Amino acid sequence: MVNMKASMFLTFAGLVLLFVVCYASESEEKEFPKEMLSSIFAVDNDFKQEERDCAGYMRECKEKLCCSGYVCSSRWKWCVSPAPWRR
């Protein structure tokens, strides 16, 4: 009886240890692509998009006018593409 309890305990402890090791290695692998992508797509201050004088698609149009090709929705106050029934 004692040997069976000890072997079950050791088996359970081994499975827990295996789970912890696998989880740790998987979390390290997940960080690597994030770091690589962030270094590839790092945006320099010179290349940042400048603030426009007009609001683009699905942007609020309360204070800014919509860019060309968009109209301000009277209901939602967003810039949307003009629909045929609105003309």
UniProtKB/Swiss-Prot annotation:
Q: What is this protein called?
A: U3-theraphotoxin-Hhn1j
Q: Tell me the leader sequence span.
A: 1-24
GO molecular function of the protein, one example? Answer: toxin activity
Q: Which InterPro entries does this one have?
A: Huwentoxin-1, Huwentoxin_CS1
Pro-peptide region(s): 25-52
> Could you tell me where this protein is found in the cell?
Secreted
Organ and tissue specificity: Expressed by the venom gland.
The record's similarity note reads:
Belongs to the neurotoxin 10 (Hwtx-1) family. 51 (Hntx-8) subfamily. Hntx-8 sub-subfamily.
Q: Which organism is it from?
A: Cyriopagopus hainanus (Chinese bird spider)
- Which keywords has UniProt assigned to this entry? Disulfide bond, Ion channel impairing toxin, Knottin, Secreted, Signal, Toxin
